[in-house]
Amino acid sequence: SADVGSADVGSANPAFGAGPPHWLGDGFFGPTDQPLPLSLTPHFRWSAFYAAERLTPITQGCRDAGVFDATEAALLDRLAATIDRHDTDEAPSRIHGDLWSGNVIWTSAGATLIDPAAHHGHREADLAMLALFGSPHLDVTIAAYQDVRPLAEGWRERVALHQLYPLAVHALLFGGGYAAQTISAARRYA
């Protein structure tokens, strides 16, 4: 089985948003035929990073593309402006960054992770992404993570918060019900 919980234990954790060692420039997020730039600008607080480098740019992109109307975009802008109240003050962890079930290859020997959007982020983000699109063995994965490095109190209440960025990306790239899902999740926190 995958050693999911220990993947980030002991990492250098320079700042939220920082890329992997020796990486220069932005990263990428999304499908290889339509990758979106992924800012790797470092921030010392998760809330500042998530607001400035994830929520604000994707909200603007969705607004410009007509995916979100003015009221919906204003809701996400308000959330970005007040997101610090949801900050848990945890140190950054090295995360996969695009950890949905399609980027986990399960074999009899365990799991292999592919197609990362690696950076230092909030460690709850990868688990939230796995939950978003239905990952096999999710309960076992979370239990293994909890055994190695227990999650902060209230982490389950923050799952949808960490799902906002990938939901909005899906709304921008694929349309469908992702815009409504994004706005529904944002209303829980704004």
Stretch-by-stretch model annotation:
Residues 68-87:
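Short, conserved active-site entrance elements at the starts or edges of catalytic domains
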Residues 46-48, 60, 89-94, 101-157, ...:
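Active-site Asp-x-Gly
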Residues 160-168:
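Hydrophobic alpha-helical segments that form the core
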Residues 1-67, 91-92:
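A cross-family kinase active-site recognition segment
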Residues 4-10, 107-111, 190:
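Conserved NTP-binding catalytic cores of kinases and kinase-like/nucleotidyltransferase enzymes
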